């Protein structure tokens, strides 16, 4: 009987916050120092004719316009184009020579979840033998994990239609 009475009384305990902490939710958000990381697309030269472009987190079934700058490459002239062998999910939109190198604008389609790499080959207009390989790497989240903060140079330009098998319009056989 004593055990039954002991469980019926609610126990109340207080929580104390250390000095300087605000009790109203300031600890529920993650804050990063501005100096820890830049919020821009990162371009890294892997070899003489190969670059890795990291575009951060993207959402599945969305299309993105990605703009980045390649440093000056002696193998390329101002007449750059994409080679005929290209990716289904990465399309070159424009190449503009700048004082820092080349401003590249492309469209990327986030077609599946995970860390994805898509490649494109850039070549000079008259010479197919001199190519530069550009690999775009993205971390694609599924649709249930929220909306990612896009890096500078990445812009969402559209969403692909989702197919959900539970919402089929097919009525079946008669």
Swiss-Prot record:
<dbReference type="GO" id="GO:0010739">
    <property type="term" value="P:positive regulation of protein kinase A signaling"/>
</dbReference>
<comment type="similarity">
    <text>Belongs to the ADISSP family.</text>
</comment>
<dbReference type="InterPro" id="IPR026794">
    <property type="entry name" value="ADISSP"/>
</dbReference>
<keyword id="KW-0597">Phosphoprotein</keyword>
<feature type="modified residue" description="Phosphothreonine">
    <location>
        <position position="147"/>
    </location>
</feature>
<keyword id="KW-0007">Acetylation</keyword>
<keyword id="KW-0964">Secreted</keyword>
<comment type="function">
    <text>Adipocyte-secreted protein (adipokine) that acts as a key regulator for white adipose tissue (WAT) thermogenesis and glucose homeostasis at least in part through activation of protein kinase A (PKA).</text>
</comment>
<dbReference type="Pfam" id="PF15006">
    <property type="entry name" value="DUF4517"/>
</dbReference>
<protein>
    <recommendedName>
        <fullName>Adipose-secreted signaling protein</fullName>
    </recommendedName>
</protein>
<dbReference type="GO" id="GO:0005615">
    <property type="term" value="C:extracellular space"/>
</dbReference>
<dbReference type="GO" id="GO:1990845">
    <property type="term" value="P:adaptive thermogenesis"/>
</dbReference>
<feature type="modified residue" description="N-acetylalanine">
    <location>
        <position position="2"/>
    </location>
</feature>
<dbReference type="GO" id="GO:0042593">
    <property type="term" value="P:glucose homeostasis"/>
</dbReference>
């Amino acid at each position: 009987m004593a055990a039954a009475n002991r469980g019926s009384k609610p126990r109340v305990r207080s929580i104390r916050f250390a000095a300087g902490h605000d009790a109203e939710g300031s600890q529920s958000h993650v804050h990063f120092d501005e100096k820890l990381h830049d919020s821009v697309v990162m371009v890294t030269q892997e070899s003489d004719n190969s670059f890795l472009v990291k575009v951060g987190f993207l959402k599945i079934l969305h299309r993105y316009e990605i703009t980045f700058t390649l440093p000056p490459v002696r193998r390329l002239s101002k007449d750059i184009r994409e080679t005929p062998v290209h990716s289904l999910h990465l399309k070159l939109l424009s190449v503009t020579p700048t004082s820092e190198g080349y401003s590249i604008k492309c469209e990327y389609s986030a077609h599946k979840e995970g860390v994805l790499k898509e490649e494109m080959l850039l070549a000079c207009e008259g010479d197919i033998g001199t190519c530069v390989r550009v690999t775009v790497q993205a971390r694609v989240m599924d649709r249930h994990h929220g909306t990612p903060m896009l890096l500078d140079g990445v812009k969402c330009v559209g969403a692909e239609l989702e197919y959900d098998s539970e919402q089929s319009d097919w009525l079946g056989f008669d």
